[in-house]
């Protein structure tokens, strides 16, 4: 179905690459050195698809990072474009502050020292 790889010179300097995606891209892919990558918009839509189903901490973490570049409305718009028959905007706004499933999930190693409690508060402030 898919595969994960850690790419880098050693354990402390690496990134995780997941190859799990089989759906057609809705947003144009990005091509770097003849390698096709999903766009940020595509990734954001995928993250909201997971959040719509309960979400994991890493998905909230990733969306929180995307909020440095995009608005919450932008990110929800990417999801709706990708999933026109999926969750509504109001349903997503409810899910983006429902941390019940993610609460028991492992806490990602954050290289920016972000805190889970602050991330939750930021989402709650955005949805108010």
Where are these regions (language model features)?
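Compositionally biased terminal segments of proteins
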Residues: 1-128
């Amino acid at each position: 179905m898919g595969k994960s790889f850690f790419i880098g010179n050693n354990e402390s300097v690496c990134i995780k690459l997941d190859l799990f995606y089989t759906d057609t891209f809705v947003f144009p892919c990005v091509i770097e050195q003849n390698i096709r990558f999903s766009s940020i918009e595509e990734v954001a839509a995928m993250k909201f698809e997971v959040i719509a189903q309960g979400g994991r901490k890493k998905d909230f973490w990733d969306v929180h990072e995307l909020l440095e570049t995009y608005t919450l409305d932008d990110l929800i718009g990417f999801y709706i474009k990708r999933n026109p028959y999926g969750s509504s905007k109001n349903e997503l706004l409810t899910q983006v502050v429902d941390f019940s499933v993610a609460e028991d999930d492992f806490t990602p190693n954050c290289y920016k020292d972000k805190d889970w409690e602050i991330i939750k508060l930021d989402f709650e402030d955005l949805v108010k």
